Amino acid sequence: MTLLEPEMLMMAVQSVLQLKLQQRRTREELVSQGIMPPLKSPAAFHEQRRSLERARTEDYLKRKIRSRPERAELVRMHILEETSAEPSLQAKQLKLKRARLADDLNEKIAQRPGPMELVEKNILPVESSLKEAIIVGQVNYPKVADSSSFDEDSSDALSPEQPASHESQGSVPSPLESRVSDPLPSATSISPTQVLSQLPMAPDPGETLFLAEQPPLPPAPLLPPSLANGSIVPTAKPAPTLIKQSQPKSASEKSQRSKKAKELKPKVKKLKYHQYIPPDQKQDKGAPAMDSSYAKILQQQQLFLQLQILNQQQQQQQQQHYNYQAILPAPPKPSAETPGSSAPTPSRSLSTSSSPSSGTPGPSGLARQSSTALAAKPGALPANLDDMKVAELKQELKLRSLPVSGTKTELIERLRAYQDQVSPAPGAPKAPATTSVLSKAGEVVVAFPAALLSTGSALVTAGLAPAEMVVATVTSNGMVKFGSTGSTPPVSPTPSERSLLSTGDENSTPGDAFGEMVTSPLTQLTLQASPLQIVKEEGARAASCCLSPGARAELEGLDKDQMLQEKDKQIEELTRMLQQKQQLVELLRLQLEQQKRAQQPAPASSPVKRESGFSSCQLSCQPQGSAHAFGSGLVVPTTNHGDTQAPAPESPPVVVKQEAGPPEPDLAPSSQLLLGSQGTSFLKRVSPPTLVTDSTGTHLILTVTNKSADGPGLPAGSPQQPLSQPGSPAPGPPAQMDLEHPPQPPFATPTSLLKKEPPGYEETVTQQPKQQENGSSSQHMDDLFDILIQSGEISADFKEPPSLPGKEKSPPAAAAYGPPLTPQPSPLSELPQAAPPPGSPTLPGRLEDFLESSTGLPLLTSGHEGPEPLSLIDDLHSQMLSSSAILDHPPSPMDTSELHFAPEPSSGMGLDLAVGHLDSMDWLELSSGGPVLSLAPLSTAAPSLFSMDFLDGHDLQLHWDSCL
């Protein structure tokens, strides 16, 4: 053991040395610390330097020792404990000091200045306008400083050892101190901006300083304080301007407040150590805060919040005003944009409250969207992004939740890329969301809110939200392209639900402006899913339409080639459809002749009603064929616009539906119905600026450039009829079709000018397999005739011919049965003028005979061009206007196999063809709803003036919409 001990010791020493060597400082460190001399400097110099440093340190320490405070001071500063006093006394003194400090802090917090005072002293950053209003004294608020003066006892509460410490916390006198006494706005409310950080109160007696006034800070304009729980949290909201102003508190009130505060203070100040105060002399601690300073702070907070809100509202209004001023000449600012059709669904964000306001005529009509629509959803991008400022571009990006960083070019590219993603189908013209919808030079764009149309128009079936903007563009071809800002394609193949807007009915409001123009809401099912819808222009009310003739090139993006191809396809489809219609018309005519032979006077009357109803259906369909390309703004070439006067087979029949109102500018009161046919003819033969007069007397001037030279020829040759004549396809031979003869309610000459003669009766029957008569159809006819006899429209001896093919593919016959002559004309009968096929010249005479015999009233002959309506027309018109059927015609499924005569008390007699067997046609795919697919769901919201029930879906399929 003794031998091992030295060895173990050596090993331990070695390990320690080794560890120290590893941890020793480098020479550089030793030199820097002055422990070792530098290698390059002599050792003597190093020693001298070290001695100097030691002497300096010694002198410093000596000075500190000499200047250190006395023990009493250290005891007072609580650095040293007081040994002379009793320990119990020391403990009590400490407790008392702490309690006093807490009381002082509580008082300062309770009497802290309110947000208004902080704003006035530049402590609280707010917007300059708000700050100016507060400082200048526009807003009066109760000042907490009024009641914040201290009693003379405030310093007495401090122990003798504490003066310096408390004084250090005292408020620092500020140069703006005098401002505290300025009359500060008094108001009943202030924002929740409570300021926690209070500057300590001055202990000196009578001193009223609250805030250590800091040099004025430039107010951060976008950082109004939003306060929670008495703490200031600056947020990015702009502070509102001040609108409420209260009377400044009178000096007497202020003095009363200060006295009250002084009375409440002594509760803590008078307490010295364990002094006893009887309960009756004790004062409620909570009362003073609520009564004086705390209540004032709450008032200031409420007032401040109100001011912020008002300021924000004012700023928004000013910004909107500025944008509105800039909109007229320049692209709209994003804030004033109303969502356009180019934005997919967000474009439906127009608030209904703002839509009606846009109905005011004028180029800025759309610009007057109320601010409620502001910033709701991004609208269409302005065309001139390059001209916009970076701030505007960033605002556009923010509206679309896109990043706003980058150069101007990057911002523009980002916006355009986003717009490309959300823009509608290429063929759809983009209706600018800007205030004025501008079109190309040759076009007139009529924009109006869908909400104005929804009351009586067919827009309801189109799925248009009332808030959407509807833009109708009358192109140079005379075609009206109708686009809604909503991009969702209407799914319903519902036939035209004619809007009663132009009928002058009490239910039609001036907002219904384009009601008649927009008879067929179905747009996207026809040729392409574009939000554009083609409109039949029937007298629109100028009041609700904003004609912005200014050209805006938003519509220039259409692919010309694609448009031409689609136009060709549409023409072919329309031609084929018209041929089928002609066949149906011929079949109907043959049936009517047979019926007339069997029941000479009676059959004539029965056919007339069918014909009228049917013609009304045709009217709705044919106008489309005639130059109204419904899908994606297809414009039918002028070849189809050929003179409608001549029954040239080329031009699709333009249905001249004149519903009791001559289209002439001087519309008689009875001629209140501007029929879709008029709009159709107008579109086809676009005449120079056309004045459309509605029954209400409102005038809409549509300047449409006409590319079809043949268009000028009016069927009746009376140029005075601006709408109906220009394009009235009424062939000369069937004079009854002349647009000028609106009084002929029973027939509107469809003048379906087909390229081939209508097939014979046998051929038509063979082509239509399911045209065999149904027993139920004859039963329905009997019911119809019974109703007619009861109403006195036909003679009692009138009976329906026993044989009436019920399944005939020409539902037109059934559709025509909404007899215009019935006292309660159904929406089907609302189109009094049926369009008999041009091929049957004798039919008009029979119809006239029937009408004259059944009503005893003379009919207006086809040659009659005078504007004065006939008594029969007046009667029909008055019936139509007075009939609730115009408004309330429930949708009914169409069955080609049966003729449903569903006399409904509210809607009068409405003929609904239920299409039971849709040969090779699956309407269910197209039906927007309903068990069978109501081809003509005449919704109560959008009653139709004529029924499309006569159309068979066999060949129409998707093109059903186009025939509207």
From Swiss-Prot:
InterPro entries: Myocardin-like, RPEL_repeat, SAP_dom, SAP_dom_sf. Residues 340-365, 715-727 have a biased composition (Low complexity). SMART domains: RPEL, SAP. Residues 251-266, 796-810 have a biased composition (Basic and acidic residues). Residues 385-419 form the SAP domain. A motif (Bipartite Nuclear localization signal) lies at residues 62-100. One of its GO terms (molecular function) is transcription coactivator activity. Residues 186-197, 497-508, 764-779 have a biased composition (Polar residues). Residues 145-292, 328-371, 484-508, 638-673, 706-779, 796-849 are annotated as: Disordered. Residues 552-600 form a coiled coil. Residues 215-224 have a biased composition (Pro residues). Pfam families: RPEL, SAP. Its main location: cytoplasm. Residues 1-291 are annotated as: Mediates interaction with SCAI and ACTB. The modification Phosphoserine is found at residues 41, 159, 174, 191, 349, 351, 355, 358, 371, 423, 484, 487, 492, 496, 520, 530, 544, 548, 605-606, 651, 687, 718, 724, 728, 810, 826, 840, 892. GO terms for cellular component: cytoplasm; cytosol; glutamatergic synapse; nucleoplasm; nucleus; postsynapse; presynapse. It is found in: Cytoplasm; Nucleus. PANTHER family: MYOCARDIN-RELATED TRANSCRIPTION FACTOR A, MYOCARDIN-RELATED TRANSCRIPTION FACTOR-RELATED. This is Myocardin-related transcription factor A. It comes from Mus musculus. The lineage of its organism: Eukaryota, Metazoa, Chordata, Craniata, Vertebrata. The gene is Mrtfa.
